C-alpha cells in the first residue's frame, strides 16, 4: 500500500483556513484532519478525539519528554501539539493527513517530515482581514490591533511554504486546494506503486 501524504496548512487568523480544510475533507474518506492534543479545558459541545484529545499538563509534558510530538507550542497557559502516532496511523492506511498549524509548528514538522506538502492561505487584502477579525470577535480596538499584529507576523513566513492560495472567492480557493492534493497524487512516486501491474504489462 502506498503511504499517505502529510499536508501542512497555515494562515493568519481570519483567512478562512478552518472552513477551507473542513470543506476539503468533507466527503473525502482518503483525507483526514489530524486531531491535536491540548491541555486546555474541554468546551461545551466539543468531542474528545474529534475536536481535540484533551489531556492534563502532566500527561502533555510526559509526551514532550518522550518526544511524542511532531510539533507543539505553549499558547498562554495551555499546550497544543500534534502527536507523531496520530499522523503516522493515518498515513499508514494510505490516506492523506491534514494539519492546521502556524508557521512555527510547520517549521517543526518539516524538520521531522521533510516530504510533507505545505500550503499558506492569504486573505485578499489587509482591509478584508481586519474586517473578518472584527466580525468574528467582540473585542476592543487594542485586542484587534494585537490580532492584526499577530496575523502580519504569521503572513511574513509565507515564503517557507510550497504553495500560496488567496482566499477571496471561497469556491475558487477550495478548488485550488483540491488541485494541489490531486497534483500530488499524480506524481510518479505515488502513482507507480498503484499502477505496478499495468506498467509491468505495458513493458512486458
Swiss-Prot record:
PROSITE patterns: GUANYLATE_KINASE_1, GUANYLATE_KINASE_2. CDD domains: GMPK. It is an enzyme of class 2 (transferase). It catalyses: GMP + ATP = GDP + ADP. It holds the Pfam family Guanylate_kin. The keyword Ribosomal protein does not apply. It comes from the Bacteria. The keyword rRNA processing does not apply. Residues 4-182 form the Guanylate kinase-like domain. HAMAP family: Guanylate_kinase (MF_00328). Essential for recycling GMP and indirectly, cGMP. This is Guanylate kinase. It comes from Methylococcus capsulatus (strain ATCC 33009 / NCIMB 11132 / Bath).
Amino acid at each position: 500500500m502506498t503511504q499517505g501524504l502529510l499536508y501542512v496548512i497555515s494562515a493568519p487568523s481570519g483567512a478562512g483556513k478552518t472552513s477551507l480544510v473542513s470543506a476539503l475533507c468533507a466527503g473525502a474518506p482518503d483525507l483526514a484532519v489530524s486531531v491535536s492534543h491540548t491541555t486546555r479545558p474541554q468546551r461545551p459541545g466539543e468531542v474528545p478525539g474529534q475536536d481535540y484529545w484533551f489531556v492534563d499538563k502532566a500527561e502533555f509534558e510526559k509526551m514532550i519528554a518522550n518526544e511524542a510530538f511532531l510539533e507543539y507550542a505553549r499558547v498562554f497557559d495551555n499546550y497544543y501539539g500534534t502527536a507523531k502516532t496520530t499522523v503516522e496511523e493515518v498515513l499508514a492506511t494510505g490516506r492523506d493527513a491534514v494539519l492546521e498549524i502556524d508557521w512555527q509548528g510547520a517549521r517543526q514538522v518539516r524538520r521531522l517530515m521533510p516530504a510533507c506538502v505545505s500550503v499558506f492561505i492569504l486573505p485578499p487584502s489587509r482591509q478584508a482581514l481586519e474586517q473578518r477579525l472584527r466580525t468574528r470577535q467582540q473585542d476592543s480596538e487594542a485586542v484587534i490591533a494585537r490580532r492584526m499584529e499577530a496575523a502580519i507576523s504569521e503572513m511574513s513566513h509565507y515564503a517557507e511554504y510550497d504553495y500560496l492560495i488567496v482566499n477571496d472567492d471561497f469556491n475558487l480557493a477550495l478548488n485550488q486546494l483540491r488541485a494541489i492534493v490531486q497534483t500530488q497524487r499524480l506524481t510518479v512516486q505515488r502513482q507507480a506503486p498503484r499502477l505496478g501491474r499495468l506498467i509491468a504489462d505495458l513493458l512486458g
